[in-house]
Swiss-Prot record:
Forms a stable complex with E3 ligase DTX3L; the interaction is required for PARP9 mediated ADP-ribosylation of ubiquitin. Interacts (via PARP catalytic domain) with DTX3L (via N-terminus). Forms a complex with STAT1 and DTX3L independently of IFNB1 or IFNG-mediated STAT1 'Tyr-701' phosphorylation. Forms a complex with STAT1, DTX3L and histone H2B H2BC9/H2BJ; the interaction is likely to induce H2BC9/H2BJ ubiquitination. Interacts (via N-terminus) with STAT1. Interacts with PARP14 in IFNG-stimulated macrophages; the interaction prevents PARP14-mediated STAT1 and STAT6 ADP-riboslylation. GO terms for biological process: defense response to virus; DNA damage checkpoint signaling; double-strand break repair; innate immune response; negative regulation of gene expression; negative regulation of transcription by RNA polymerase II; positive regulation of defense response to virus by host; positive regulation of DNA-templated transcription. SMART domains: A1pp. This is Protein mono-ADP-ribosyltransferase PARP9.
């Protein structure tokens, strides 16, 4: 999955005939575009995001979600509804793509692979660049960026004419691109995320040395860009630049490209996030030339296989049933941030073995002391439990091997025991090593088979349990990873053959992004959005829909607002399709459960979600009108407010991390909630209504308004609505109304975090509003309260709020949304490693200077080396 800007604004470039420095060009362009940066402005000084669900930030992130061919066919027939739901619910634009069905030829073939330097791999591929899945594709362009024929023409034909339009804008702004220069545009409908247009030299015998130097210059500029100036690029595909219509001799061309790449990285210590360089062509002579040059300059292919092959991704995720997520992760077991980490060892020696030693080293001496007690015990248990101590987990499950018991049965029983211990409500995630493959010397394929069997059996038996199961493979243990990868693929295929629609998703997990991209020809949902959080939520919703075999549950309190028209739609769906729909309403939440065959199920869910989006907008619109009315009361500014209403709703933008917010961030993280983003809320109309309410409370009671900073968790789907019209009890997460039917806030982040851990899986994002709440006069709450009780028996005036404990309140309940003003929205996760993923640093305020531009811009490198 990728998350890149797809358009860039024109930048001033070095003029032809001058030596171009990439660093200099970039700095000049940046200074010209964003002069406020020179004046030392912090991120808080940049223009904020405007509006409601769709902010005007023009930085786009593009992700691809792989799906099965049968799912593609179903979604294709519901594509307009899918687009509408993703747009209205998550603010994302979506398209469907299926290269194989579109007539693409044979799958991509890799014919050479070699480690260039530690951390970067170079490979040669036979593939069509218009369908090669990498982060950036290099186009062989001309000085005018007119993409009419050859590779350039093919890229525009497949990717869309917007690529040519962006190129024309660049030329209009900066003029021709010099030979050796590059320009960056979006990729349109191509499976990559941006195109690097490189202007290669034309070959002439009389000026051959100049052409050679210019080709080297172009390659260096490409490498500079992907290693220094766009740190989000991990994979780049480069063609045999200039070897086509520019008539550069093929073998000389490929040799120069390889030698330039080798020399570029020879002494480099820093190379950004780049991990793979693909040399790509769909023509056999060019592929052969690239391969020959690679072997000559880099040495022979060190791969263990003889023929073309595609690497598996570094992380695999499989959704099983309703609540279980199974992942294969490359990483260190002792660094996992799940609730449980699994260790193993012989009964009298839990300290032997590489995994055990790594865990003990990280956990500290306290765990060693605990295990010393276990070693002295004569009782045999399959699994011993200790605290996590200095590990980032709550518990460690120690699997005890026994030399006199069948090792296959031990592993089977140990897996079952570990998983059953996860039924405790405070455990939502567990990390296993490749159990049995070390000290027990089980065949790796056998261990994988047993571990998967037990996970699947657990998921089948405990369908309602939300649990993330990670199998963590040490990064250098490629053989074990491939074996577990193959077993996961086999299990996924079995799910699909049995009618389960669960899509096997190759995606980032535990902070790692997949390396190789989608398999060529794989159908996919292409998502584009302006916020990483929105994209995560959209992906989670899609996967939850597709993993359901024959049922889907929609939880949305706006179901309470469905009228006759909407219920007629539900009835019509049950008549015209093979689905049944049941509605459940409780004091905590309202749900619709849809059951039926997969195709009908997806169709019904799409239509219902569209309907609920309309209802939510209608309800919010009415509340907004009331809000405008309240904010104008008692003032002489009604006419001014009326004019503002036409052009202003609210602002939600990255907050500058003041000392106060940094301290608050530490409070979140102390409770196990890792902050990925904090946004400030600015809604002048809501603030005016809040201040009016505050004034009324201060005039009414001697205690005044009693303002406090409190917290409330809100589902993603209601975050923008709260920013727009304020808090309402139907917008919060489900709760037990033990103190009355009001709007619940908490003073304690620890209490909020404890509730999150019991109800949310570790891979979900958590949204917490920090608000100024007018508590005023309060009393003990009661479940029968629909408004606060009177100030005293028989009094007409009532309290302003109720609490859980009058002497030391932790939970505060108000019954009027105007008593709470949202100030900040904190987006968190329980997975610390996920919170450190580089995607969160793009456009969010995680520290001084960590802000992306609020403009689209095309960056051009121009100039000549001679």
């Amino acid at each position: 999955m990728a998350y890149y800007m797809d358009t860039w604004a024109a930048a001033p470039a070095e003029r032809p005939g001058m030596i171009a420095s990439l660093s200099l060009s970039f700095k000049k362009a940046f200074a010209e575009l964003f002069p406020q940066r020179r004046r030392g402005h912090s991120e808080g000084d940049y223009p904020p995001l405007r509006g409601s669900a769709n902010n005007s930030l023009e930085e786009h992130y593009r992700w691809q979600i792989p799906i099965k061919h049968n799912v593609f066919e179903i979604l294709k027939s519901n594509e307009s509804q899918l687009c509408e739901v993703l747009q209205n619910k998550f603010g994302c634009i979506s398209t469907l793509s299926c290269p194989t069905l579109a007539g693409s030829s044979s799958p991509a073939q890799r014919v050479f692979r070699r480690t260039l330097i530690p951390g970067i791999e170079l490979s040669v591929w036979k593939d069509d660049l218009t369908r090669h899945v990498v982060d950036a594709v290099v186009n062989a362009a001309n000085e005018n960026l007119l993409h009419g024929s050859g590779l350039a023409g093919s890229l525009v034909k497949t990717g869309g004419f917007e690529i040519q339009e962006e190129s024309k804008r660049i030329i209009a702004n900066v003029g021709k691109i010099s030979v050796g220069g590059i320009a960056i545009t979006g990729a349109g409908r191509l499976p990559c995320h941006l195109i690097i247009h490189a202007v290669g030299p034309r070959w002439t015998v009389t000026n051959s040395q100049t052409a050679i130097e210019l080709l080297k210059f172009a390659i260096r500029n490409i490498l500079d860009y992907v290693t220094k100036y766009d740190l989000r690029i991990k994979t780049v595909a480069i063609p045999a630049l200039s070897s086509g219509i520019f008539q550069f001799p093929l073998d000389l061309c490929t040799s120069i490209i390889l030698e330039t790449i080798r020399l570029y990285f020879q002494d480099k210590q820093m190379f950004g996030n780049l991990r793979e360089i693909h040399l790509v062509s769909n023509e056999d002579p060019t592929v052969a030339s690239f391969k020959s040059a690679s072997e000559s300059i880099l040495g022979r292919d060190l791969s263990s296989w003889g023929g073309p092959e595609t690497d598996p991704a570094s992380t695999m995720t499989l959704r099983i049933g309703r609540g279980l997520t199974l992942q294969i992760v490359q990483g260190c077991i002792e660094m996992q941030t799940t609730d449980v980490i699994v260790n193993s060892g012989y009964m009298q020696d839990f300290k032997s073995g590489r995994v055990a030693q790594s865990i003990l080293r990280q956990a500290g001496v306290e765990m060693e002391k605990e295990l010393d007690k276990v070693n002295l015990s004569t009782d045999y248990q399959e699994v011993w439990v200790t605290k996590g101590f200095k590990l980032s987990c709550q518990y460690v499950f120690h699997v005890a091997w026994h030399s006199q018991i069948n090792k296959y049965q031990i592993l089977k029983d140990a897996m079952k025991s570990c998983l059953e211990k996860c039924l405790k409500p405070d455990i939502n995630s567990i990390s296993f090593p490749a159990l049995g493959t070390g000290l027990m010397d089980l065949k790796k394929s056998t261990a994988a088979q047993i571990m998967f069997e037990e996970v699947f059996a657990f998921a089948k038996e405990h369908k309602e349990k939300t649990l993330t199961v990670k199998i963590v493979i040490f990064p250098v243990d490629v053989e074990t990873y491939k074996i577990f990868y193959a077993e996961m693929t086999k299990r996924s295929n079995e799910l699909n053959l049995s009618g389960n629609s669960g899509a096997l998703a190759l995606q980032w997990s535990s902070g790692e992004q997949r390396r190789g991209g989608l398999e060529a020809g794989s159908p996919a949902i292409n998502l584009m959005g302006v916020k990483v959080g929105e994209m995560c939520e959209a992906q989670e919703w899609i996967e939850r829909l597709l993993v359901s075999l024959d049922h889907h549950i929609i939880e949305n309190n706006h179901i309470l607002y469905l009228g006759k028209k909407e219920h007629d739609v539900l009835s019509e769906l049950q008549t015209s399709t093979r689905v049944s729909i049941s509605e459940t309403v409780s004091p905590r939440t309202a749900t619709l459960e849809i059951k039926g065959p997969q195709a009908d199920l997806i169709d019904a869910v799409m239509r219902i979600e569209c309907m609920l989006c309309d209802v939510q907008e209608e309800v919010a619109g009415k509340r907004e009108k009331n809000l405008w009315s309240l904010s104008g009361q008692g003032t002489n500014q009604q006419e001014k407010l009326d004019k503002m209403e036409e052009s202003y709703t609210f602002q939600r933008y990255p907050a500058s991390l003041t000392q106060e917010l940094q301290d608050r961030k530490k409070q979140f993280e102390k409770c196990g909630l890792w902050v990925v983003q904090v946004e400030q809320i600015d809604n002048k109309v809501l603030l005016a209504a809040f201040q009016e309410k505050k004034k009324m409370m201060e005039e009414r009671t001697p205690k005044g308004s009693g303002s406090q900073r409190l917290f409330q968790q809100v589902p993603h789907q209601f975050c923008n609505t709260v920013c727009r019209v304020g808090f309402h009890r139907m917008y919060s997460t489900s709760y037990n109304p033990v103190y009355g039917a009001g709007i619940y806030f908490t003073k304690s982040l620890k209490n909020l975090a404890d509730k999150v851990k019991k109800t949310s899986s570790t891979d979900k994002l958590i949204y917490v509003f920090e608000a100024e709440v007018l508590t005023g006069s309060f009393c003990q709450g009661n479940s029968s309260n629909i408004i606060p009780p009177p100030l005293s028996p028989g009094a007409l005036d009532v309290n302003d709020s109720v609490v859980d404990n009058v002497s030391s309140p932790e939970t505060i309940v108000v019954f009027n949304g105007m008593q709470a003003m949202p100030l900040y929205l904190w987006t968190c996760t329980q997975d610390r490693t996920f919170s450190q993923h580089p995607m969160w640093s793009q456009g969010y305020s995680s520290g001084p200077g960590m802000v992306s531009s609020l403009q689209s811009w095309e960056w051009v490198l121009n100039g000549s080396s001679v």
